[in-house]
Amino acid sequence: MKPNVVSADVLFEEFRNLLKWEWVAGLGASERRFAEVAVRAARSGADLVGYLNYIHPYRAQVLGEREIAYLTNATPEDCKRRIARIVTLEPPVLVLADGQAAPDEVVSMCERAQIPMFSTQESAAFVIDVLRAYLSKHFADRTTMHGVFMDILGLGVLITGESGLGKSELGLELITRGNGLVADDAVDLYRINQTTIEGKCPELLQNLLEVRGIGLLDIRAIFGETAVRRRMRLKLIVHLVRKETLERDYERLPYEPLTQDVLGVPVLKVVIQVVAGRNIAVLVEAAVRNTILQLRGIDTYQEFVERHRRAMERGGAS
């Protein structure tokens, strides 16, 4: 699900302190929003904000020094035509950056067309970076998954599995080994760009871990600030299963790395069998270390296959 609403007044208040901008025109259009068609088609925040460009309608248009020069340094007829074309773009908001003074013609156009215009001393590049990051997260595809989301050895790991296998207890043991908790039970996941999933904890559950028989634990209060994380990028899913499930549904040595689709992004996946006597925390950390190697281009299984092939060739030659 992708939210499709952010109005000019919300955007203005969100960055009033950071960008120190002023609302210089179009005050009566505080409810003006990004067009739903643009939001649905956007692949990231980069599609929703940028420098003035006549071939990209429906996005926030930023006017820096060069854009203002283009609009004002021409014959009166050309200047009027260039400014009038902005209306056809139907921007949700115009942002005047680089400390540029608002040309009277642009202000008049915004008042007539009821287009909000903000003015800031900050550079146009900085304004675009800030707005793109905000809009990427605000309009991101999102979902909620059940599991324990953790920072393990610097990697965002989502622990999932069948009910009653001890996911939260495993999370607690991993915390005692120096890893960090992001979320327990419900994990909010966002696709912030075409290849990246970011996860965080719902506000109601922040810092909390539920362990059967003990109840709710405030991890931040018990283990300190370093035991919790606000958000992490999802890089690995560790799925816990019972012995019969593993034997029925999974190969012992899969030829290709397992993946799971999350919001259209393939995420590496490891399946771990849970039986009495196994140190699951050690196995999870080993899986994470192996995933880090895979992300660096080192595939232990493929290296073994190649080693086995060379051994067979040597045996056949002799």
Swiss-Prot record:
Matches recorded under InterPro entries: HPr(Ser)_kin/Pase, Hpr_kin/Pase_C, Hpr_kin/Pase_Hpr_N, P-loop_NTPase, Ser_kin/Pase_Hpr-like_N_sf
Region (Important for the catalytic mechanism of both phosphorylation and dephosphorylation): 209-218
SUPFAM superfamilies: HprK N-terminal domain-like, PEP carboxykinase-like
Catalytic residues (UniProt): H146, K167, D185 (proton acceptor), R252
Catalytic activity: [HPr protein]-L-serine + ATP = [HPr protein]-O-phospho-L-serine + ADP + H(+); [HPr protein]-O-phospho-L-serine + phosphate + H(+) = [HPr protein]-L-serine + diphosphate
Needed co-factor(s): Mg(2+)
BP terms from Gene Ontology: regulation of carbohydrate metabolic process
Residues involved in Mg(2+) binding: S168, E210
Domain of life: Bacteria
Region of interest called Important for the catalytic mechanism of dephosphorylation, as start-end residue ranges on this chain: 273-278
Pfam families, per the entry: Hpr_kinase_C, Hpr_kinase_N
EC number: 2.7.11.-, 2.7.4.-
GO molecular function annotations of the record: ATP binding; magnesium ion binding; phosphorelay sensor kinase activity; protein serine/threonine kinase activity; protein serine/threonine/tyrosine kinase activity
Annotated ATP binding sites: G161, E162, S163, G164, L165, G166, K167, S168
Protein's job: Catalyzes the ATP- as well as the pyrophosphate-dependent phosphorylation of a specific serine residue in HPr, a phosphocarrier protein of the phosphoenolpyruvate-dependent sugar phosphotransferase system (PTS). HprK/P also catalyzes the pyrophosphate-producing, inorganic phosphate-dependent dephosphorylation (phosphorolysis) of seryl-phosphorylated HPr (P-Ser-HPr).
Family from the record: Belongs to the HPrK/P family.
Subunit structure: Homohexamer.
PANTHER family: HPR KINASE_PHOSPHORYLASE, PROTEIN YJDM-RELATED
Other comments on record: Both phosphorylation and phosphorolysis are carried out by the same active site and suggest a common mechanism for both reactions.
HAMAP family registered for this protein in UniProt: HPr_kinase
Name of this protein: HPr kinase/phosphorylase
Lineage: Bacteria, Pseudomonadati, Pseudomonadota, Betaproteobacteria, Burkholderiales
